[in-house]
Amino acid sequence: MTTLYEGAYAKLNLTLDVLGTRDDGYHDLRSVMQTISVRDDIEIDVGTGKPWELHCDMDGIPTDEGNLAWKAAKLYLDTIKKDPDGITIRITKRIPEGSGMAGGSADAAAVLRALNRHYGEPLSIGALAELGAAIGSDVPFCTICGTAMVEGRGERVRPLPNMPDCLFVICKPEFSISTPEMFRKLDEKQVYKHPDNAEWNPPFFQAISVRSARTCTMSLIPWSLRRIWN
């Protein structure tokens, strides 16, 4: 039996523009995403000789095939046609649930990276990200990490210059808002005005290119998404 360890890093949406609905029921997005240091810890025992198991230290998280980490392991092993002779996945949660920080997607991406490394990296990071798109919209970015422009429903990830080292203040209230509910409210409001912080905002992208955290922050004001809930 071999035990694998991998960090599952959360993400923030530095910008988020919802461009419209798609025929498949998803929404087309344009977002600058950023990996941050908040993370879940993933341990994977490969070759346990037992049926698959998944354990998580946070209540309310699925511990069966409904968990994205489980789905990622199965999809990866089916893709490379490997039988691991039993897998146990252990997840130590630190990413707040229902925070929009891609906790489940980050876990799935970490499983993809860990298993790919274990089997000698038969898939490139781009192929892993493409595989992740079948699991969840945030999985491709969470597989690649860093700073990136993410488009489509999340399957198109274009790396940008890395943000400078800086601190983000993250305030997670006691309540949570589900992503499907957020998009449903957006559709109900029929918001047609797009924020100025999308790709056509030169100050924001110039700020990223010169790695200026303060300039990046100032270029994102005002924040347009608040009117969805008013």
Residues of each region from the PLM?
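Conserved, helical-rich catalytic subdomain that frames metal- and/or nucleotide-binding sites
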Residues: 144, 149-230
